C-alpha cells in the first residue's frame, strides 16, 4: 500500500511538472493593451485596466453588471482609470464571436458600452441561438436601444468586425490566458471575479504608486 501511495504521489508530481513545462504560457513582450478597440475613460488616466471577457461567462456577467458600473462612476468617469475591453470567445463558441461582432457594430454608432451591458443582461435569451436566428435577435436588441437597425444589420452581415474579435482571441491565447474574466490592472494579471472592495484596494494601490 505504501508503495502505491508513493507511486501516486510521484505520478501527480510529474503531471504538475508537465503542466508547468508544457501548459499554456504567454509569449514574452506582449502588451495586453496594444490595439484595443474599445475603451472607457481618458487616454491620460494614470492607470489602465484591460478586461478580457466572454459574453456567456457568468463571472464576467457579474462583473459587467454589478461591479463595472461602480468602477465607472468612481474611477473611470473621474479620470483615474482608462478601461479597455477585449473579447475572449472560447473554441467552438461561434455565437460569442457573433455577439462580439455585434458589440463592435454598436460601437460604430457610438454605443459599445451600452450594447456590451445589454448582451450580458440578455445572455440567457441568446446563448443557445445560432445562425440567422441569432443575427435577428442581435439586430432586434440594437433596435430596442434606439440604434439604426438597417445600418446595424448591414454591419453584422458584412462580417467586417470578425477579424478584430479573432485578433483579441489570438492575443488572449498568446498571453497564455485560460479563463475569464482576466484583467490586467496596471500590468498585473488577475483571473476570476473580483468584488468591488478588491478592485478598490488594487486600484487605490496602483494610483498611489503613480504619484
Regions of interest found by a model, annotated:
Residues 19-28:
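Hydrophobic single-pass membrane-insertion segments
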Residues 45, 50-143, 153, 173-178, ...:
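Structural alpha/beta surface segment adjacent to cysteine/selenocysteine redox centers
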